[in-house]
């Protein structure tokens, strides 16, 4: 499970996430019409309140929410199309930007001055939240909208693996990054902007980053909320960048179990003594590979 005390310390001072620097955030947003790119990870840890609720309580004019893969609440299966809806608590519209539409349209941005991005990444090139960030940055550049990133630590805080080569661009590889890029989302947004990776426009994005306080690269960080349905704990987050490649095969990585991305198996006893059976498991995966078949392999728990 995730650690119950996720906060870390640098030089004996408590970490303060970008979203928790509410004095800075509200100063940037007061008097502006705001859109949010957020999900279930957009929590102010110290107060245990969602960013949307915190901003509404501060009197910020939040017009709409844009939801990435897995949706605003983070409950959708991998690849599941997310539908538009409304937040039950605030009544604010939630617009999906995962599925047919990967970025906000000019019409959807028409009544906004600024977009705020606050989503927890796990540091892997093919984790789609950073792809969503790229496309929202493109939309902001195309429509002259301000884009603000509230920064968070990267739990896989190192660089590893080959760089995505030209000609292999996709939604799980938008930018030419190594498999593990080692950047926070704020640093990555800055790099996308400065390297000219926003291909749909010659313009750069009007980018601002609300940095963390009392954090530096190398500080450990344990996520307090699972970032997506099949990354339920710290071990799965560590193993995901490696085991994810098996998803291009018919080998199960444990989707449909309580330990996804911590096991490997195939329905053949020759592959090992460890067994597991993927099933339809709400909250994890309802239609996993090798569903209802006994898989033999190994555990990395």
Where are the model-predicted features located?
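Short internal beta-strands
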Residues: 61-70, 150
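Bacterial Sec-dependent N-terminal signal peptides
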Residues: 2-13
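Glycine-rich oxoanion-binding loops at beta->alpha junctions
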Residues: 83-112
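Conserved small/polar residues in nucleotide/adenosyl-binding loops
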Residues: 1, 301
